[in-house]
Curated annotation (Swiss-Prot):
MF terms (GO), sorted A to Z: RNA binding; structural constituent of ribosome
Family: Belongs to the eukaryotic ribosomal protein eL30 family.
Transferase as UniProt keyword: no
SUPFAM superfamilies cross-referenced by the UniProt entry: L30e-like
Residues annotated as transmembrane: none
Presence of keyword Ribonucleoprotein: yes
Example of a GO biological process term: translation
Keywords: Ribonucleoprotein, Ribosomal protein
Domain of life: Archaea
Cellular component, GO annotation: cytosolic large ribosomal subunit
Name listed for the protein in its UniProt record: Large ribosomal subunit protein eL30
Organism phylogeny: Archaea, Methanobacteriati, Methanobacteriota, Methanomada group, Methanococci
Annotated InterPro entries: Ribosomal_eL30, Ribosomal_eL30-like, Ribosomal_eL30-like_sf, Ribosomal_eL30_CS, Ribosomal_eL8/eL30/eS12/Gad45
């Protein structure tokens, strides 16, 4: 089985942002996860430890999968087409993207 390259994952994230419904930012992601919304959380590699712990706590309660991207928050923001850092994003609807097929196995 072929592992997904970071370019495939980056493309899937961008397609999800462009065609689906995605929430950007840690505060909004956590808020939506608490309400049981979302299908996948993607966090940047350099996401703050306390925020990362909060995200993992609430995703365990809601059984929402988490993918830790190997990009920094600045790079993740650029992947999303935004001029600001993005430490976390929550995929509510993937749109035309195959982002939900991503796994965290390295």
């Amino acid at each position: 089985m072929r592992r997904r390259s970071s370019m495939d994952i980056n493309r899937a994230i961008r397609v999800a942002v462009d065609t689906g419904n995605v929430v950007l930012g840690t505060k909004q992601a956590i808020k939506n996860i608490k309400h049981g919304e979302g299908q996948l959380v993607i966090i940047a590699d350099n996401c703050a430890k306390d925020v990362r712990e909060d995200i993992f706590y609430y995703t365990q309660l809601s059984e929402t999968p988490v993918y830790t991207h190997q990009a920094t928050s600045i790079e993740l923001g650029a992947i999303c087409g935004k001029p600001f850092p993005v430490s976390a994003l929550l995929v509510l609807e993937p749109g035309n993207s195959a982002i939900l097929n991503v796994n965290n196995e390295e």
